[in-house]
């Protein structure tokens, strides 16, 4: 849905990304974006000499408001872990014919620039990402930097404020407006806390062929799910992976830390595996885990930041393994799974297999039947179901 975004007398149009998604009813901005933008303008915090850092801007709602086609543009740096969010910001700036000459995008693992004057911070869903970003911010800014965070009021708890207080300094909140709230932090001169990320832990691997069993060492950046142990869904999926032939082309779609693709390669070192995710931290974690555990097969691996399987050649892959996410930012939606399934059908060779795991209540078998014309139940328990579909 293209949403008219009228704030501070600026009439802009924002689209949620990807623009082709099935569920187009979700808008690309929220009341926290409005509140934050209005506060910045009311307080005259930004001018042409200001260096502004924007964190976790879902689809560019904040960026487009500071990339106006005038000579008074501030320098705007957007920092995001999400490839989709970054692409959404670029798309919306272009669609509104805005000046991006003072606009730069960084990923979540890039070093932050020095001399930032104002930080506009959308609070992420992940507490671990929040902690990691605050630690990196504290390392990079001086005490005079203005820091304002925003989120829905119901998501800002006393525990959230304690995290800001611990890592940045004195923390205060605004009144709620349209169910959104702002958080103001004054940087103190206390020592920066040491980052606990990436976390490192081990899992046992029992080979399904004649290779010896071994321990696998897993490294997880802050924004990667299951940071300290193998989650129960991944464990169940690993127990029900198919046998992979030598020289097979495999995609670990939505790979996270890459443990599924890593398991495939531990069982079949002659497979070719592409790890795909939209999170910079996920792709970095997956690559590190191959380098740590199976460095000899790194040449058989690709690591790709992508929106599902966009631009992957059709009819080119033997097997796709996927645990589809059902959240995009704070929204619960099934359009990501639907896109992944459609893309998988296009990318698979004839006779190729899509194997997925999902929560029982998500009823993915209906979508698989609709797309592939077939679906096989591989295994199920009280919570999860593993299913397979073959491209005919």
UniProtKB/Swiss-Prot annotation:
UniProt KW Transferase keyword: yes
Catalysed reactions listed for this entry: guanosine(1835) in 23S rRNA + S-adenosyl-L-methionine = N(2)-methylguanosine(1835) in 23S rRNA + S-adenosyl-L-homocysteine + H(+)
Any Pfam family matching the protein: MTS
Coiled-coil region: none
Matching SUPFAM superfamilies: S-adenosyl-L-methionine-dependent methyltransferases
InterPro entries for this protein: DNA_methylase_N6_adenine_CS, rRNA_m2G-MeTrfase_RlmG, RsmC/RlmG, SAM-dependent_MTases_sf, Small_mtfrase_dom
Location of this chain's protein in the cell: Cytoplasm
Entry-linked PANTHER family: RIBOSOMAL RNA LARGE SUBUNIT METHYLTRANSFERASE G, RIBOSOMAL RNA SMALL SUBUNIT METHYLTRANSFERASE C
Homology family: Belongs to the methyltransferase superfamily. RlmG family.
Protein name (record): Ribosomal RNA large subunit methyltransferase G
Organism: Colwellia psychrerythraea (strain 34H / ATCC BAA-681)
Lineage of source species: Bacteria, Pseudomonadati, Pseudomonadota, Gammaproteobacteria, Alteromonadales
């Amino acid at each position: 849905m293209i949403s008219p975004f009228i704030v501070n007398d600026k009439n802009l149009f924002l689209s949620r990304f990807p623009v082709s998604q099935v569920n187009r009813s979700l808008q690309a901005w929220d009341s926290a974006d409005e509140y934050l933008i209005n506060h910045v303008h009311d307080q005259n915090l930004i001018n042409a000499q200001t260096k502004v850092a924007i964190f976790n801007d879902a689809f560019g709602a904040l960026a487009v408001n500071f990339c106006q086609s005038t000579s008074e543009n501030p320098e705007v740096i957007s920092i995001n872990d999400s490839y989709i969010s970054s692409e959404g910001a670029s798309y919306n700036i272009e669609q509104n014919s805005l000046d991006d000459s003072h606009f730069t995008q960084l990923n979540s693992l890039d070093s932050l620039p020095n001399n930032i004057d104002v930080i506009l911070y959308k609070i992420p869903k992940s507490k671990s990402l929040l902690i990691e970003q605050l630690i990196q911010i504290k390392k990079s800014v001086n005490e005079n930097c203005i820091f304002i965070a925003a989120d829905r009021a119901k998501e800002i708890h006393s525990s959230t404020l304690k995290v800001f207080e611990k890592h940045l300094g004195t923390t205060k909140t605004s009144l709620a407006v349209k169910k959104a709230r702002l958080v103001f932090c004054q940087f103190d001169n206390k020592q920066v806390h040491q980052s606990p990320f990436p976390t490192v832990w081990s899992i046992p691997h029992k080979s399904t062929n004649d290779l010896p069993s071994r321990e696998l060492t897993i490294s997880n950046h802050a924004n990667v799910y299951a940071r300290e142990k193998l989650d129960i869904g991944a464990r169940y999926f690993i127990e029900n992976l198919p046998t992979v032939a030598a020289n097979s082309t495999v995609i670990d779609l939505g790979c996270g830390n890459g443990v599924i693709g890593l398991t495939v390669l531990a069982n079949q070192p002659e497979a070719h595996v592409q790890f795909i995710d939209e999170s910079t931290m996920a792709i970095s974690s997956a690559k590190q885990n191959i380098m740590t555990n199976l460095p000899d097969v790194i040449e058989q691996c690709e690591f790709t930041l992508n929106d599902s399987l966009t631009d992957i050649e059709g009819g080119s892959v033997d097997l796709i393994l996927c645990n589809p996410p059902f959240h995009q930012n704070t929204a619960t939606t099934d359009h990501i799974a639907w896109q992944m399934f459609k893309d998988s059908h296009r990318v698979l060779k004839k006779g190729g297999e899509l194997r997925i795991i999902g929560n029982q209540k998500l009823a993915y078998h209906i979508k698989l039947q609709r797309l592939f014309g077939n679906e096989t139940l591989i295994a199920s328990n009280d919570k999860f179901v593993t299913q397979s579909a073959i491209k005919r």
